[in-house]
């Protein structure tokens, strides 16, 4: 895949995808509106604090890659921007509404479980259940022109695996799996060490109690 977004580029594209659906009356977005969207505290991970100059620099980079258009009318003093990332006449990347929503959320929030995607896309599309989300994600992972997403190793203490988009480069799943295993082993060792320390303290307390009982018995029998 030719696309390899930086963190700022992923945020800008994700915001344009989101606002195209959730606030169509305000789309395409002005620079001010796009900056506000990038810095939202809800549905963003991480929360960012980009200034307009940084957002504009990012927009210019995406324009060079032909992934954003300035659609302001002739003579207008305010620029307005729309994406050319997918589902447009300018490119071959086509997604269903569910695929569009899932990619949008992953661009804005990073790795997500199927359950999280179902919950966090409710303003963008509908899923009947988590299995439908998983089937859609598997389709993106096995897409003939992709893959567009990858299933990540399940983290220690987590019930579900998460999925990550591949529009910011390949993900080394084997390295992640090794890191997860190492973290899990380290966590277990740490827990064992803590338990051993607790047992040592219990033993010391018991020895002290026994010594006190001996002293009490000796005083009673003397």
From Swiss-Prot:
Pfam families: DUF480
Superkingdom in the source lineage: Bacteria
Gene3D superfamilies: Winged helix-like DNA-binding domain superfamily/Winged helix DNA-binding domain
Covalent S-S links between cysteines: none
Family from the record: Belongs to the UPF0502 family.
PANTHER family xref list: UPF0502 PROTEIN YCEH
Classification via HAMAP family: UPF0502 (MF_01584)
Protein name: UPF0502 protein PBPRB0676
Organism whose genome encodes this protein: Photobacterium profundum (strain SS9)
